[in-house]
């Protein structure tokens, strides 16, 4: 079966969310500019807001897995 390539902006969002879960600084964004950087920062911000709203680390992992089912597999 042919694998479908993931959308780069979706991947950037997920990676940003994961960075937020791990408590990393937003200044560590690997993207210099453009839509990928914006999506990475959006993911990072959403993760931080979820932490402030009381989500546990496990709940955050579950949330991102539900939003993007293939994101945590690699």
UniProtKB/Swiss-Prot annotation:
Name under which the protein is recorded: Ribosome modulation factor
Protein localization: Cytoplasm
Keywords assigned by UniProt, alphabetized: Cytoplasm, Translation regulation
Predominant subcellular localization, coarse grouping: cytoplasm
Organism: Cellvibrio japonicus (strain Ueda107)
NCBIfam families from the UniProt entry: PRK14563.1, Rmf_CrpP_fam
UniProt family annotation: Belongs to the ribosome modulation factor family.
Signal peptide: none
Matches recorded under InterPro entries: Ribosome_modulation_factor, RMF_sf
Role summary: During stationary phase, converts 70S ribosomes to an inactive dimeric form (100S ribosomes).
GO cellular component, one term: cytoplasm
């Amino acid at each position: 079966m042919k694998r479908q390539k993931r959308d780069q902006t979706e991947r950037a969002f997920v990676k940003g969310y994961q960075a937020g879960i791990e408590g990393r600084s937003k200044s560590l964004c690997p993207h210099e500019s453009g839509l990928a950087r914006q999506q990475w920062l959006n993911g990072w911000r959403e993760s931080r807001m979820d932490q402030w709203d009381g989500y546990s680390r496990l709940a955050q992992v579950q949330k991102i897995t539900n939003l993007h089912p293939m994101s945590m597999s690699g």
